[in-house]
Swiss-Prot record:
Entry superkingdom: Eukaryota
Name of the protein: General transcription and DNA repair factor IIH subunit TFB5
Single biological process term from Gene Ontology: transcription by RNA polymerase II
Localization terms from the record: Nucleus
Keywords: DNA damage, DNA repair, Nucleus, Transcription, Transcription regulation
Quaternary data: Component of the 7-subunit TFIIH core complex composed of XPB/SSL2, XPD/RAD3, SSL1, TFB1, TFB2, TFB4 and TFB5, which is active in NER. The core complex associates with the 3-subunit CTD-kinase module TFIIK composed of CCL1, KIN28 and TFB3 to form the 10-subunit holoenzyme (holo-TFIIH) active in transcription.
Annotated source species: Yarrowia lipolytica (strain CLIB 122 / E 150) (Yeast)
Stated role: Component of the general transcription and DNA repair factor IIH (TFIIH) core complex, which is involved in general and transcription-coupled nucleotide excision repair (NER) of damaged DNA and, when complexed to TFIIK, in RNA transcription by RNA polymerase II. In NER, TFIIH acts by opening DNA around the lesion to allow the excision of the damaged oligonucleotide and its replacement by a new DNA fragment. In transcription, TFIIH has an essential role in transcription initiation.
The keyword Ligase is assigned to this record: no
């Protein structure tokens, strides 16, 4: 008999998908299924966790010229 699992369909760029897979690699409770290069099925209760972790990762890896100028002037 078929088994159905409730999930949330996520459509994203392959680079963002790689970040989500990286997040899931430490916990293994986020991704229910990798559908293709741009689609994932994730656990409904983990949507906010994924958003928070992605925002944190993207903020850490975003170049901010104002921040570099402040470091250069010693502020």
């Amino acid at each position: 008999m078929p088994k159905a699992t409730r999930g949330v369909l996520i459509e994203c760029d392959p680079s963002i998908k790689a970040l989500i897979v990286n997040i899931d690699s430490s916990q293994h409770n986020i991704i229910l299924d990798e559908l293709d290069d741009t689609h994932l099925m994730i656990h409904p209760s983990m949507v906010e966790v994924v958003k928070q972790k992605l925002n944190k990762m993207l903020a850490e890896n975003t170049y901010n010229p104002n921040e570099e100028a402040a470091k250069a002037t010693g502020k």
